[in-house]
Curated annotation (Swiss-Prot):
Description of how the protein assembles with itself and partners: Part of the 50S ribosomal subunit. Contacts protein L32.
InterPro entries per the UniProt record, alphabetical: Ribosomal_bL17 (IPR000456), Ribosomal_bL17_CS (IPR047859), Ribosomal_bL17_sf (IPR036373)
Region annotation (Disordered) ranges: 135-190
One of the record's GO molecular function terms: structural constituent of ribosome
Lineage: Bacteria, Bacillati, Actinomycetota, Actinomycetes, Micrococcales
Protein's UniProt name: Large ribosomal subunit protein bL17
Length: 190
């Protein structure tokens, strides 16, 4: 499925890694969310998303391909019927990884990987994109007339724009140290 990674594998050998990923994917599709280590969750995510993409196709060849990887027919049936219909309108991003802290025994970083089954409303996505575009266009529209106005006033007085430039430079100088202090405070809070 996904291209193999270089370096150490999960569980030792490549065959064991394939079996571990298949079992993790089967557990994910059966329970809709599982708790595992962050490393395993990151390796499982593209594997599971590829299987969901096959399930969305829904044809016999895709079903047989998934059955070659996940041997549990009940889980494959659930993947092709329930999960594929739930993510039908989603164009990817079928899984979500949430870090939950370290395991008590060996302090391994743990994560919850879950299927994203919430419905996607195409209308809401279009509205969100339109509002973002409008928000970006509004400041640009305000800056354009402001630039034209000083050009017209230059003929009358040349000292006024120079005073405005120094005022904007001072304001920018005051904002720059404040911006540098904010990340330092965030690092201290963590």
């Amino acid at each position: 499925m996904p291209t193999p990674t270089k370096g150490p594998r999960l569980g030792g050998g490549p065959a064991h890694e394939r079996l571990m990923l298949a079992n993790l994917a089967a557990a994910l599709f059966e329970h809709k969310r599982i708790t595992t280590t962050v490393t395993k969750a990151k390796r499982l995510k593209p594997y599971a998303e590829r299987l969901v993409t096959f399930a969305k196709r829904g044809d016999l060849a895709s079903r047989r391909r998934v059955l070659g990887l996940i041997s549990n027919k009940g889980v494959v049936h659930e993947l092709f019927t329930d999960i594929a219909q739930a993510v039908e309108n989603r164009d990817g991003g079928y899984t979500r990884i949430t870090k939950i802290g370290n395991r008590k025994g060996d302090n391994a970083p743990m994560a919850v990987i879950e299927l994203v089954l919430e419905p996607v409303s195409a209308k809401q996505a279009v509205v969100a994109e339109a509002t973002q575009a409008a928000a970006k266009a509004a400041p640009a529209a305000e800056e354009a007339p402001a630039e034209e106005a000083p050009a017209a006033e230059e003929a009358a007085t040349e000292e006024a724009p120079a005073a405005e430039e120094t005022a904007t430079e001072e304001a920018a100088a005051e904002e720059a140290p404040a911006a540098e202090e904010a990340p330092a405070e965030e690092k201290d809070a963590k």
